[in-house]
Amino acid sequence: MKSRFLIRNTKITNSTGYRPVAWLFFMLYATVCFLACSNATDEAAQFFLKGNVQLQKREYKEAIRYYSEAITKKPDFADAYNNRGLAKFRNDDREGALADYTRALDIDPDFNTAYFNRAEARLETGDPGGSLSDLQRVEKQYRDSTFYQVRLGDTYVRLTKLSDAQSAYDRALQLKNDNVEALTNRGALYYSQKAYQPAEADIRRALQLNPKQDAALNNLSLLLAHRGNYADALTYVEQALELQPRQPYYLNNKAYLLLKLNRPSEAFPLVQESLQRDSQNAWAHQTLGLYWLGQKQSDKALTEFRIAEKLDASVDQLYYYIGMVEMAKGNRARACEAWQRGELANDDLAIKQRALQCL
C-alpha cells in the first residue's frame, strides 16, 4: 500500500544509532560460527570482522568490500553473504541484497536470520507474498520478537490484509510498548482507515519517544494537512527531510503542501525529484497533476491523474480531481462517472460534487 504516509522499516536503537534488527541476530550467529571455524578460514574470518566494523560505522561500501573479500577466501561463507546483503540494503541496493540473502540460504537452508532479512528485501522489491513466506518460515523462532511482529504487520499492509496487520502491530506493542516503529506504522494504518484520533495518538507517542523519527514526523505533517493546517504541516515534513533528504515520499509531501500554500514554483522541482526517485508513487503523480491543474493545463493534469489511477486507484480525492478536469474540458458525463467512482471510494469531495453537478 503506497501512500503519502510512510510505513517505516523495523529498526532498533543502541548507543551507535540505528541498525537493522537483524544485526542482533547475525552477531549472535557469527559468534557461534567463529568459535567453531577452523584455522583454514581465519583469513576469511578477519575480513568478515572488518566488514562488521564498517557496517556498524555505516560505511556500507567499505563493508561490502570486506565481505566480498571474505567470500573470495571462503565461497560458501553464508554469514558473509547475509551481512553483505545487509550492507547492500542499507546502501539502497535492494536487488543486490535480495540476491545475497538468497545465496546465503542456498548455502545454509536453516539460516533463520537470512530468511528474516530477505523478508524485508522482498517487501521492498514488490514481493509481499514472498516476504510473508519467509516470515512464516521463521515464525516459531521469532514470533515473540516485537521487531518480527512489526515486519509481519508491514507485510500484511502491503497484502491489504489490514486486520492481520493491526493484530501484528498490537502484538508488537504488547511485547514492547515503546516500540517507535510499531507506533509509527500502526498510526499510518489507522490513518489509512480514517481513524484519525488513534492515528495521531500513536504518532505523537512515537515522537515523544524519538523526536527524530522521520516517518513519524512525515505522518504527523499529513495529519495536520488533513485538518488544513498546511503551514504547521510544512514544518514537520521539513524536519523529516532534514533527516532523510532523498526520501521520495517526503519530497512529494512537501511539494503537495507547497501547492496548498500557493507556492507552485517551489513545489514543481520537488515533485519532479520525487518521481525521479520513485516513478511508481501514485501520490506523486497526483501532486504533479495538481500542479498542472493549477497552471490551467488540463491535458497534462489529466494524464498525471490517469497514471495515478493506474498505479493506485485508492489515492485520496483522485476521482474528485479527475472529475474536475473532465468538467473543465466540457466532458460532463465523464466527470459524473469519475465522481461516482469516488463515491464508491468514500471520497467526501467527490460525493459532494456529484450531488451538485450530476443528480
Segments predicted by a language model, with ranges:
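Bacterial signal peptide processing site
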Residues: S38-A40
